[in-house]
Amino acid sequence: MRHSIIILTAFALFFAVWYFNLGGWPFRAFTEGSQAAHYFVNYVVAGLIPAAALLLLHRPNEIASSMGLSRGFGSGALFGVLATLPMLIGYACIGTFDREVSADHLLTRVVIAGFFEELVFRGFVFGQLFRYARWGFLPAALLTAVAFGSLHLYQGHDLQSALGAFGVTAAGSVFFSWIYAEWNFNLWCVVWLHTLMNLPWIVFS
């Protein structure tokens, strides 16, 4: 029960700080003009909350391992490349390369989103609830999916498309949670998978 309370409270506070840009607001003079800088700072500041929670749950030298960050970077990268290569080839064949996409937008939507979303939603929320709070896979994965889907409601331009974005990303969240668990909680697998799945969505139209 203690683990669940700490994890859920920390995540609720993180989500509020991140969603309302409270982390990036004090630094807006430094991040103005760069979406990537704003997103990075907002994630880092908001991320101090789950980081503090992890210090309550684990010894400092065990935190990276509890998140799945202490090993498997190379195997995660290989998995991500092989899993998304057909997607990249498919988009290249049927899509049009967007020559106007900026490096700042690419960094924001591919690298920062892919890394931090998996760090928080998979490594912290799902991983900590499933592995250490002893939640079952489905309860932990579904709660994470609802939160993850809600994060992407903005992608819809009306109610129907917003619900569609929610459904697709929530289902994707369950899939990422399953991959994370099946790969022995190697977070790099889902970080690379998420990042490289975002890439063709951004660079091809």
Show the residue positions of the predicted features.
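Alpha-helical transmembrane spans of integral membrane proteins, capturing the lipid-embedded, hydrophobic core
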Residues: 7-15, 43-51, 77-85, 141, ...
